[in-house]
């Protein structure tokens, strides 16, 4: 139904409308009110934009306003030669190229400041890193949120809890999944929630992987969303903040691409799964 009609706490009708997402529909609703401002009648339905006629005047205004945006978005910031699974869904399911390169960029930025790992949630990523030229517009599509890079201290226990929480959705996949650089982990998607992670390792300064130590303190570059407890990541909200760079994750990625392009080596796996014994 359009609109959905509910009752307000006072018993008056409340009209609720939605047009889904991705600008597919334009809402259209005509409402009549009485003297008390209470809706008395209504009529309308969402209009599919593909069928809506355009306005030449509005199109002209949009085109004029779009010129500087198009120029900015077409600016090339780097090049990628790697083809691998990537995009919104892959970044919520396991390793994905955009998250691997982004966390590498975060760690590259923060390592001189003492960081040994970089963490961000898979839900941050909304597009794939294109193969070929990478533009500013691609970066905006990839990381549309204004997440910032923070430097924080965490115990190994807190990092383990974050990884565990990251795979607590159905089948271990979802936006809360931890994407990382300098850290890798293995989990069982069929194990009980809270008991899925089988191992977590951290890479030392010589490139060797060592088991995460619960009582050791690690410095991490982490997205502000996670550090604020986003996606219910309580463990990451509990860290001790060292600094707030003020830099957007997207800007750190852009600087990294300018420095490291072309991206030509497929990153080593960081998220692995194991099957539970059948018990037969």
Tell me what each language-model feature is:
Residues 75-95:
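Glycine-rich phosphate/diphosphate-binding loops and the adjacent beta-loop-alpha structural elements
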Residues 4-15, 25-28, 35-42, 96, ...:
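Feature captures C-terminal
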Residues 40-61:
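Short, exposed interaction patches on small structured surface elements
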Residues 61-65, 124-125:
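Active-site neighborhoods of metal-dependent hydrolases
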Residues 21, 32-36, 43-49:
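Surface-exposed loop and adjacent secondary-structure segments within mature catalytic domains
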Residues 63-78:
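Acidic, glycine-rich low-complexity/disordered segments
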Residues 16-20:
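Short beta-strand elements at the ligand-binding edges of bilobed clamshell
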């Amino acid at each position: 139904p359009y609109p959905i009609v509910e009752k307000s706490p006072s018993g008056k009708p409340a009209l609720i409308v939605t047009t889904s997402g991705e600008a597919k529909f334009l809402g259209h609703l005509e409402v009549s009110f009485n003297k008390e401002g209470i809706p008395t009648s209504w009529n309308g339905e969402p209009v599919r934009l593909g069928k809506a006629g355009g306005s030449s005047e509005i199109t002209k205004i949009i085109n004029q306003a779009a010129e500087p945006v198009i120029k900015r978005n077409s600016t090339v910031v780097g090049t990628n030669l790697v083809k691998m699974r990537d995009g919104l869904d892959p970044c919520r399911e396991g390793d994905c190229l955009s998250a691997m390169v982004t966390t590498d960029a975060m760690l590259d930025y923060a390592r001189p400041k003492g960081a040994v790992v970089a963490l961000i949630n898979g839900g941050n990523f909304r597009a794939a890193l294109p193969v070929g030229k990478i533009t500013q517009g691609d970066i905006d599509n990839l990381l549309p949120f204004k997440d910032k890079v923070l430097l924080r201290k965490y115990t190994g226990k807190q990092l383990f809890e974050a990884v565990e929480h990251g795979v607590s959705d159905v089948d271990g996949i979802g936006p809360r999944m931890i994407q990382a650089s300098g850290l890798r982990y293995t989990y069982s998607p069929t194990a009980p929630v809270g008991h899925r992670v089988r191992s977590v390792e951290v890479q030392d300064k010589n490139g060797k992987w060592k088991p995460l130590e619960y009582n050791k303190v690690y410095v991490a570059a982490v997205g502000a969303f996670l550090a604020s407890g986003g996606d219910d990541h309580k463990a990451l909200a509990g860290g001790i903040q060292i600094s707030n760079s003020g830099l957007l994750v997207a800007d750190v990625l852009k600087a990294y691409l300018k420095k490291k392009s072309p991206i030509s080596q497929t990153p080593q796996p960081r998220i692995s799964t194991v099957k539970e014994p059948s018990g037969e």
